[in-house]
Amino acid sequence: MHESKLTRRRFLKGAAVASLAVTAPYVVPARARGAKGAKAIFNGKDLTDWDGYPRFWSVQDGAMTGITTKETPAPGNTFIIWRGGVLKDFELHVAWRLENHNSGIQYRSKDRGKWVVNGYQADMDGSSTYTGILYEEGGRGIVAQVGKKVTVGPNGKPKVTGTVSDAKKVKDAIKLKDWNQYVIIGRGNHLVQKINGIVTVDVTDEDEKRRAMEGILAFQLHAGGPMKVQFKDITLQVFGDE
């Protein structure tokens, strides 16, 4: 997430009113399911094709690892960036483990230089308060809370149009300080995030001025207190014109 924690608390106005009760299990659209032909984009041995602040990023026990300490704090939110291509229409699978604090997976994002990234973020935090939300780093802030189906209008304002899962069940399914899996799917302006097999958000972004149809992939190491985050089993499926 963004450095300012206050933006985290800007809950979507009227979300509770607009939310719809879950009457049946949410089903990801057929065109967004499956990852046949996915390829590994992290070799588990070194940081080939990945670019991050060397002081903070390394490979430990087969996992990409970001660490800050009291003696070596991050100067601000810093990211390790995949240099192997850009994300357009895709399905991404990532195993992750967070010991404390906050991190996230940036996708279709912008490289601002010096390992600073802005854009869509699949969020995660040590208490699972924000894990699963869609956040826009350096932009519109919280786009969708956990469990919500959201349409972002041309004016940039998110509107809850339905429910995709129960937020408490999502939180209960997250294994604190242990390995979890994120699946992120982007097709056109439609974005879906899943954690441990449960859909956390479903977003249609109709804000043509601020949405991103393509961009980079990166992982966040958040400014603030000491933290450790790890990523492994990173696979990417790229969808062509169909």
Q: What are these regions, as identified by a protein language model?
A:
Residues 24-29:
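C-terminal segment of classical bacterial N-terminal signal peptides
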Residues 20-23, 242:
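Alpha-helical transmembrane segments and their juxtamembrane interfaces
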Residues 3, 31-242:
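Carbohydrate-interacting regions of secretory-pathway proteins
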